[in-house]
Design a protein with these regions (language model features):
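Rossmann-like dinucleotide-binding core of oxidoreductases
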Residues: 233-306
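Hydrophobic/small residue at the entry helix of a nucleotide-binding pocket
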Residues: 120-124
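Conserved N-terminal Rossmann-fold NAD(P) cofactor-binding segment
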Residues: 142-180
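Short beta-strand element of Class I
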Residues: 136-140
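Rossmann-like NAD(P)-binding element
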Residues: 166-226
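Glycine/serine-rich phosphate-binding loop and adjoining beta1-alpha1 elements at the start
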Residues: 1-110
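Long, compositionally biased stretches enriched for glycine and/or charged residues
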Residues: 52-70, 282-409
Length: 409
């Protein structure tokens, strides 16, 4: 395999093009980047691998399983990847190398975070990040309601620290939204009121929120944003897909791959489903110490008592309870926003920036589907482990269902 050096990266072109100023390299070194060129609508953009065979595998439910290693003679690159790791970069995206450099850059300053939307979820998330976000150097807030922004700016800058400095809260303008490392999007339209009788609240919000997100996706494109767009408002998974696609449309509405990479858009709705499954398991006396959740936030969720020792009946009951747990809160006359804001957003996002495992929806075969991953400088690293065949089939069914929805929407 050909190797080239570009800046501090070792590039290995496998169909993807090297930058023109790349020069030949004699031996592999870290970070090693495999360059591919794949359909940008249905392929990942930047992701970490630990085994050479992961570079070539199809984007199906199989990415949850331990990678299948071909019985080939020892290869220098195979041994190098096993020892040092690597990543795959899809050069079909015009911003591929810019994002690669940004994510690999050593962080010398605290994170700058922009929060869009100060409703119930946004306000709760802001409180959590103010108190817990020791990695955050600036919390920038934006909401069309100027009084709401000013209120949070005043009150949260009057909070005393407990054991670490607290990030200042400042109001930002629309034209500086993407001057940050992470943009957290919680704004929402058309949330059905309590008692409305709407069966699937998340899907009822989809079209209105999708329209609202178009302008923000266009701004991300215009500003050449290389950070993370964290989609939090519902329905998380299809809206994350919509943000990615809208950011990659030109003025004529054509997809051109000149916007965000798929992994730059991550959906945060799965954390609360894990928390609900754990709570329901505790109430029902079910061992969830090795439990997992996969798939979309809401309908299509897959909760499993154990990835390998999978009990279909027990897991089906857990899934049903987790999916409908929010309705119990609505039946009491309240909007169920506290647990999602804390579990899906605050805890998951802080786990991401700390390099810890976190629940989120990321791209797989052109749709955004939830599973556990860990963020690295080489992109997200998928958690891979043996899965019961029935559980794997459920995950693949959820993926295909979401694929049909997203591609028809």
């Amino acid at each position: 395999m050909e190797l080239k050096q570009w800046h501090d990266f070792c590039l290995c072109p496998l169909g993807g093009a090297c930058p023109p100023d790349a020069v030949p390299a004699d031996a592999p070194f870290s970070p090693l980047v495999f360059l591919v060129r794949r359909d940008p609508l249905r392929s990942r953009g930047l992701f970490a691998v630990t085994v050479l065979d992961e570079v070539f595998e199809a984007e199906t439910a199989g990415v949850l399983l331990p990678p299948v290693q071909r019985p080939t003679p020892a290869e220098p690159l195979r041994e190098f990847v096993a020892a040092n790791g690597a990543c795959v970069l899809n050069t079909a995206f015009s911003a591929a190398f810019s994002v690669l450099e940004r994510w690999n850059r050593e962080r010398t300053e605290p994170l700058r975070v922009t929060l869009v939307g100060l409703g119930d979820v946004g306000g709760t998330l802001l409180l959590a990040l103010k108190l817990l976000g020791r990695e955050i150097g600036a919390l920038r807030i934006y909401d069309p309601n100027a009084a709401q922004c000013r209120r949070y700016e005043l009150e949260l800058n009057q909070v005393l620290p407990l054991d670490h400095p607290l990030p200042p809260v400042t109001v930002c303008t629309e034209d500086t939204l993407f001057d940050c490392d992470l943009l957290l999007f919680t704004a929402s339209r058309g949330v059905p009121p309590v008692g409305s009788g709407v069966a699937d609240v998340r899907l009822a919000q989809y079209e209105k929120n999708r329209v609202m997100l178009r302008s923000y996706a266009a701004m991300a494109r215009k500003t050449h944003f290389t950070g993370l767009f964290c989609q939090i408002s519902d329905p998380v998974d299809p809206l994350a897909c919509a943000v990615f696609r809208e950011s990659n449309r030109n003025a004529a509405g054509e997809f051109d791959g000149c916007g965000l990479l798929p992994e730059q858009v991550q959906g945060f709705g799965l954390g609360v489903m894990e928390a609900r499954a754990r709570w329901c398991a505790q109430e029902d006396g079910i061992d969830f110490s090795n439990g997992r959740v996969y798939g979309p936030h809401g309908g299509g969720l897959v909760a499993a008592n154990d990835p390998a020792a999978y009990d279909k009946a027990v897991s089906a009951r857990l899934t049903e309870r987790a999916v409908h747990a929010n309705l119990e809160v609505r039946a009491l006359g309240f909007k169920p926003y506290l647990a999602p804001a804390l579990s899906s957003a605050a805890v998951s996002i802080l786990s991401l920036v700390r390099g810890q495992p976190y629940d989120a929806a990321l791209p797989l075969g052109g749709v955004w589907l939830g599973a556990q991953r860990r963020m690295t400088p080489l992109g997200p690293l998928q958690r891979r482990e043996p899965l019961h065949p029935a559980l794997l089939a459920r995950f693949e069914a959820a993926r295909l269902e979401l694929e049909a929805f997203c591609h028809d929407a």
